[in-house]
Amino acid sequence: MGHNGNSYYIGIDLNDSYAMVSFFQQNMKEPETVSTVAGSEEFQIPLVLARRKSIGKWYYGDEARRLSKSGEMVCIDRLLKRALNSEKIVIDDDSFMAEELLALFLKKVMELPSKLGNPSSFDRLVICVDRLTKENVSMFYGMAVRLGINSRQLTVIDRKESFYYFALNQDKSLWLHDVVMFMQEKESIFFYSLKRDLRTTPQVVSIDESISYTLDKNDKDKSFLDIINESFKNQIISTVFLVGDTFAEGWMKQSVALLCKGRRVFMGNNLFTKGACYAAATRDREAEWPFVYMGENEMKFNLSLKVHDKGELSFYNLISAGSNWFESKGQCEVIISGSYEVDFWKQLPKSREAKIETLRLTDMPPRPDRATRIRITATPVSDDRIDIEIKDLGFGEIFMSSGKVWHYEMTM
């Protein structure tokens, strides 16, 4: 599918208990979240699979949970944790890897929007999880083929990044100042504050996360009021988002009055699945996006080479600040002119100045000028460290490669 008004995106919010799925097209006002029950506002799909013992048919979600109460079904839950632990699950005489079953569950969830008459294929799938690790990112990308897509169609983000995409895809009046979110997770309340640096182009966006708070069960309203007062110190806030079942229980009186004082307040549990859809759509039009997100998983500096291309001097960007270091990789082939040295340009997104770091290719066999081609590969190993590999490719059949490879770890 092309990246036009008909481009189609899927966003899944996933944890070890449930999934939520939304879909989005550029001609829609906002993403739409899908329920397994037509007309229902119950969007959480339990992360459960069940299989009938006598036959190989699989059920998922609420239906799997309901059917598992009969003795004819085998029920499997906590699939995300089991998949990350590479568990093997045995049912009757069959054995399955948990990752395989998680992919089966996700495939069924991904098919839900198509049952509403939407396309069966899509441009991009974004999966949102609580936190990113090298292990879960690697697992999801390894799962792409089972999901019927290629890895270029898949993106994995965490909840903070989903909040970033959700908030900044709203009407501009909602993010004139800071945007904040209170999120309930079991007994804890977490506070997130999104700030934009107006001095930079593009604007650098950061999200601060507070320590967790606990509501006093005897007086939730007063307890939340205290949390709000503590969290809102020294901030001008345009909009507040409330995510979690507890906020819909009807106990907010004084606290909601304070929240709404000069601010817009929204409540709902499907923010992260909608944010995942916005992430998918935004990444297909990144050139128009006036922000760069600097979270804990995002690269902290730009890494470039200065090259001559068709007679013009230009910068070739290997790694971009704000790109997720789990996913980023840069590679190019260049012909060396002059000495056997490569200059790397390092720049912070908030700075106009660049640092130049020169790597000398020691023990390179002598050749005429412009008769050596090298391949440069830049692979981040964290959000502020990049492994540089430079490989001598020789020069066609005239000068064979020496086979030499140079490694260096680069920091800002």
Spans of features found by a protein language model:
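Conserved phosphate-binding catalytic cores of ATP/NTP-utilizing and phosphoryl-transfer enzymes
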Residues: 1-10, 150-180, 271-292, 367-368
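Acidic low-complexity intrinsically disordered segments
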Residues: 288-412
